[in-house]
From Swiss-Prot:
Keywords: Glycoprotein, Immunity, Protease inhibitor, Secreted, Serine protease inhibitor. GO terms for cellular component: extracellular space. It comes from the Eukaryota. Glycans are attached at residues 11, 226. This is Ipis-1. Salivary protein with immunosuppressive properties that can modulate blood feeding of ticks on vertebrate species. Inhibits proliferation of bovine peripheral blood mononuclear cells (PBMCs). Inhibits IFN-gamma (IFNG) production by bovine PBMCs. One of its GO terms (biological process) is immune system process. The keyword Secreted applies. GO terms for molecular function: serine-type endopeptidase inhibitor activity. It is found in: Secreted. The keyword Secreted applies. Pfam families: Serpin (PF00079).
Length: 377
């Protein structure tokens, strides 16, 4: 059951990332999101969707049954066990127009499977006050890292309901970087240009893996408690991130993560970084195949018998900071591979001094919580 959630989120993560990455002539820019958070919000919508609307949402979540709600429920029940080593808080809430009749079966499922609170509000009479209330709740859940999720004008008197998922993560490295070892270093933006950044240094034993097809080496940095970790996917060349993005698939990523092994005497250089991104996901999700959800064709009759209910947008905001102590992050998805048996020299250099991809995931079950890439610092 838990393996299914891993597969759902991993496949969704790769599909989503491919839509968010820079494309065409626009090869600059960083990417950061929480596939888990977005998938959870979509899954809550799926619970009330019917007909083609349900089929389209289910397809991008890579599920074909209702068990996905049980999978999320089982994962959320495990969260208390992550403390005190890491802080991982996930909260779900639905804001519903007070005159809008919700089906009892739907609200019961949200409460049971997603531990969601449901709040009746006055969109019709004071939409902006509700917007500020939503923003205040998200800010509280994410320890003030996600502010102003809903911009002025995004909520109006015609709004019937808002589904909100907020996730907050703070993990200390199992072995922290010494601040005194942090020194200026070059981060290569292109083969011709570089930028001086704060580069953290550490020598130790790390899990590593390699995929020749993706031309990438992976290194895992565990957080305290070993229930979560960050994985750095470092392309061979300065311009290799585009190759990685083009050829990345869920099976390849799964095989890479599953084939990592402990390697001794690794000299790691990792830049400190901080990212914050706000994304309107309507166009992204429509490109992935969720089309009816945002139009008059939407069938959300499992939420309410009232007709004319559709989504106006899915708004996602995410934050991550990586420093010597650890990581703080927040946010309001069969190929047979053979991996080379690498014979490394006595000391292996893993210098993250060029564009790279990274993800933060839990281990039990293995779920991608956050995913992103750094092209610019």
């Amino acid at each position: 059951m838990e393996a299914s959630l891993s597969n759902h989120i991993l496949n969704f993560s790769v599909d989503l990332y491919k839509q968010l990455k820079p494309s065409g002539k626009d090869t600059a820019g960083n990417v950061f999101c929480s596939p888990f958070s977005i998938a959870a919000a979509l899954s809550m919508a799926l619970a009330g969707a019917r007909g083609n609307t349900a089929k389209q949402i289910a397809a991008i979540l890579h599920t074909n049954d209702d068990k996905i709600h049980d999978h999320f429920s089982n994962f959320l029940r495990k969260l208390p066990s992550y403390a005190p080593d890491v802080a991982l808080h996930i909260a779900n809430r639905m804001y519903s127009e007070q005159t809008f009749h919700l089906k009892a079966e739907y609200t019961t499922l949200l409460q049971k499977s997603y531990d969601s609170t449901i709040k009746a509000v006055d969109f019709a009479g004071n939409a902006d006050r509700v917007r500020l209330e939503v923003n205040a709740w998200v800010e509280e859940v994410t320890r003030s890292k996600i502010r102003d999720l809903l911009a002025p004008g995004t909520v109006d008197a015609l709004t019937s309901l808002i589904l909100v998922n907020a996730i907050y993560f703070k993990g200390l490295w199992e072995c922290q970087f010494k601040p005194s070892a942090t020194k200026p270093g070059d981060f290569h933006l292109t083969p011709q240009t570089s930028k001086t950044v704060d580069m953290m240094h550490q020598k130790g034993d790390f899990k590593m893996g390699h995929c020749s097809d993706l031309k990438v080496t992976a290194l895992e940095i565990p957080y305290k408690g070993n229930k979560t970790s960050m994985v750095i996917l470092l392309p061979k060349d300065v311009e290799g991130l585009s190759v990685l993005e083009e050829h990345l698939t869920a099976p390849k990523l799964s095989a890479l993560l599953g084939g990592m092994y402990v390697t001794s005497d690794v000299y790691l250089r990792l830049p400190k970084f901080k990212l914050e991104q706000s994304i309107g996901l309507k166009d992204v999700l429509m490109a992935m195949g969720v089309k009816d959800f945002f139009t008059s064709l939407a069938d959300l009759s499992g939420i309410s018998a009232t007709g004319n209910l559709c989504a106006s947008d899915v708004i996602h905001k995410a934050f991550v900071e990586v420093n010597e102590e650890g990581t703080e992050a927040a946010a309001a998805n069969a190929i047979r591979l053979r991996y080379m048996c690498l014979r490394f020299p006595q000391v292996i250099n893993f210098f993250v001094d060029r564009p790279f991809m990274f993800l933060i995931h839990s281990h039990d079950p293995d779920v991608v919580l956050f995913m992103g890439s750094i092209r610019e610092l």
